[in-house]
Design a protein with these regions (language model features):
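Catalytic, metal-anchored helix/loop core of enzyme active sites in primary metabolism
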Residues: 1-322
Length: 322
């Protein structure tokens, strides 16, 4: 959904963009439609069966079609301006690290890559002088709010969570739920994997870990707060008594658009009705209902091993569930 949203944004300003590369796993039909529309010459299709189907079709003989991300060195002859890395799961880490040296700016929407490989990503960003922008709505909001602000002024950062589809359900009722219920998020249109992570609240645990790594803030300065409407994306309390609250509509177009244009272009999107601010609802995150948030108290400050294991275990459980 991140990729489709970005494509739709670029369609509105097509004359100012040249897309050099598109990639997909199994959804090659959608990829080919996009490639045809934008006249994209380079495609990466990681699913072996999908790759063979396209490669053997003479209709696409004028395209450069690859099966893995080691082809970057063949595709890029100079640094491109912008890259979106939104490959789901830990498999997104390697291509994210590889692409950094070929791009001036990278927007990353892959939690697992940041959690498991931030040290490698950051080292690469510094080496190749590549600008980084987080695309998760919470991290983009924090990043935006902290521009030109010293980190030592921060007292606490609250990451908001909607509570997912089961906020009003008792823990007993959660013992018998199906895939459709789990993936039916009340506020966001997302893929099945991230919707499942949202329902269990492990998604928010991952976001706290991300924030710790990206903004170099200790876990004791980060907290989860339930905000069912999802209008507030981050709350930052400062030691000088002031608090910053970042509010925007529940539309991933907003962080994606601003990552692309660096907040220098006006967005054509649904404007937030400020009447909603009359009824903002905040609640504490209940560890009895969402026991996975207890994991945050177990995480050591200075190692990624536990976090990497957590990501791997969650990936496997979600795969088995779906």
């Amino acid at each position: 959904s991140i990729g489709k949203t970005l494509i739709n944004i670029i369609k509105q300003d097509k004359k100012n963009f040249e897309i050099v590369l598109l990639s997909a796993d199994g959804n090659y039909k959608q990829l080919l439609k996009q490639a045809k529309f934008f006249k994209v010459k380079n495609l990466i299709i990681t699913n072996q069966n999908s790759y063979k189907k396209v490669k053997e079709n003479r209709f696409y003989k004028n395209m450069n079609i690859y099966n893995d991300f080691s082809s970057f060195r063949k595709i890029f002859k100079r640094k491109i301006d912008y890259t979106m890395s939104s490959i789901s799961g830990i498999q997104g880490l390697k291509p994210t690290i590889e692409i950094i040296k070929y791009t001036k700016k990278i927007a990353i929407a892959n939690k697992e890559a940041i959690i498991c490989g931030w040290d490698l990503i950051e080292k690469r960003l510094n080496k190749h002088k590549t600008k980084f922008i987080p695309v998760d709505s919470e991290h983009f909001s924090i990043w935006y709010a902290l521009q030109e602000i010293e980190k030592n002024l921060i007292e606490k950062i609250y990451l908001t969570a909607s509570g997912g589809p089961f906020l009003g359900k008792s823990f007993q009722k959660l013992k018998k739920v199906n895939i459709k219920q789990v993936t039916n998020h009340p506020n966001w249109k997302m893929g099945k994997k991230i919707s499942t992570d949202s329902a269990t609240m492990i998604n928010k645990v991952f976001e706290v870990i991300e924030a710790k790594k990206i903004f170099k803030i200790s876990y004791n300065k980060l907290a989860i707060i339930i905000h069912p409407k999802s209008y507030v994306h981050a709350i930052i309390k400062f030691k000088n008594g002031l608090t910053k609250i970042i509010v925007h509509d529940t539309d991933m177009k907003i962080p994606i658009f601003n990552s692309l244009y660096s907040s220098k272009k006006f967005i054509n999107s649904k404007k937030l009705d400020f009447k909603v601010l009359n009824n903002l609802d905040f609640r504490g995150a209940n560890p009895k209902k969402f026991p996975l948030i207890k994991v945050l108290k177990m995480l050591p400050e200075n190692t990624s091993l536990f976090e990497t294991i957590l990501v791997s275990i969650n990936d496997k459980f979600v795969e088995l569930f779906l």
